[in-house]
Regions:
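Short beta-strand "acidic-cap" motif of Rossmann-like dinucleotide-binding folds
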Residues: 34-36, 129
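Rossmann-like adenosine-cofactor binding region
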Residues: 41-143
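Glycine-rich NAD(P)-binding loop of Rossmann-like domains
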Residues: 1-22
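C-terminal helix-to-coil terminal segments
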Residues: 2, 87, 134-195
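Aromatic pocket-lining residues of Rossmann-like dinucleotide-binding sites
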Residues: 26-27
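Hydrophobic "lid"/C-terminal helical patch
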Residues: 23, 64, 120, 171, ...
Length: 195
């Protein structure tokens, strides 16, 4: 049985915040080509991280055999990863033998799970791993859980002692900053402060 190497393979990161940039650093160390789609990201930040910033999400899917999702769930991102986009992935074309792979540890609902199952069955996607689902908890009878090329975990990606300690420390720091009358660095919806 032969596998394929990650070195030289294109990794597409949907969203390019702190976590995605950390994933990019590890993937780059393994020799992967780093691509991202983030409509809010300045090109300068992508360049500083050695990533190619795609202006259109379809371009990311056309280029990358590996997709990792790192964006928030919103009306804009609901079912962002769907049958149409998974069919664009290049892993079955032009003699590329590595296949196509999707990972979502961000939020359930970004991946259309019915479309993902169909893509796994028709070969557009070779393997997928989700830590988050549109309806949680996902059960053992969930159709994706029954597919041999699917790996699912019950939203436990951050369930380590160290991660939980960091979360507690980050929350305490944000509360203290707010009590000092300042805006916490980790605030994600600053636009609502003025309302």
């Amino acid at each position: 049985m032969n596998g394929t190497e990650l070195s030289g393979k294109p990794l597409g990161l949907i969203g390019f915040g702190r976590i995605a940039q950390g994933v990019a650093a590890v993937a780059k160390a393994m020799g992967m080509q780093i691509h991202t789609y983030d409509p809010y990201l300045p090109v300068k930040i992508a360049r500083q991280q050695g990533a190619f910033l795609h202006k259109k999400i379809d371009s990311l899917f056309e280029t990358c055999t590996h997709i990792s999702i790192h964006c928030n769930l919103s009306d804009e991102t609901h079912h962002l990863v769907n049958a149409k986009r998974m069919a664009l992935m290049p892993g079955k074309a032009n003699g590329i033998a590595c296949g196509n792979h999707i990972v979502n540890c961000a939020r359930g609902g970004i991946v259309n799970e019915d479309d993902l199952l169909e893509a796994l069955e028709n070969g557009n996607v070779t393997s997928a791993a989700l830590d988050v689902f549109e309806i949680e908890p996902a059960t053992n009878g969930h159709p994706l859980m029954l597919h041999p090329n699917f790996h699912g975990t019950p939203h436990i990606g951050a369930a380590t002692l160290e991660a939980q300690q960091r979360v507690g420390t980050d929350i305490a720091a944000a509360v203290m900053t707010t009590l000092d009358g300042k805006v916490a660095e980790t605030l994600v919806n600053k636009e609502f402060l003025s309302s």
